[in-house]
Amino acid sequence: MANLEKIVEDLSTLTVLEAAELAKLLEEKWGVSAAAAVAVAAGPAAGAAAAAPAEEQTEFTVVLAAFGDKKIEVIKEVRAVTGLGLKEAKDLVEAAPKPVKEGVTKEEAEKIKAALEKAGAKVELK
């Protein structure tokens, strides 16, 4: 155990360039790649992240995917939902796909989605 502590202490004194050189030397010596080690380490993290969405989502983002044929109606509805001015609402609609409202409850997101779809827009909830 004392040897490991000494190694850790010695490694802690290396500069970034020396550490990079050490990594290259170890890759050559052991016939491995640091990139492969990173990919292996990232695997379990992705699995843990996939388990997280099993919980109920509480905040939603309403995204305007497309404005469809009724652009003016969609602009009016975006103004009503967001409180934006005419130019800002028009710019948002024309830049679709674009978030209209972020961090809203599920009920509010569904209400906004229904209103925008009624105006002719294609809407996604994220």
Swiss-Prot record:
Cystine pairings recorded for this chain: none
Keywords: Ribonucleoprotein, Ribosomal protein
Entry keyword Ribonucleoprotein: yes
Superkingdom assignment: Bacteria
GO CC terms, sorted: cytosolic large ribosomal subunit
Protein family (similarity comment): Belongs to the bacterial ribosomal protein bL12 family.
HAMAP family per record: Ribosomal_bL12
Protein name (record): Large ribosomal subunit protein bL12
Organism the protein comes from: Methylocella silvestris (strain DSM 15510 / CIP 108128 / LMG 27833 / NCIMB 13906 / BL2)
Gene: rplL
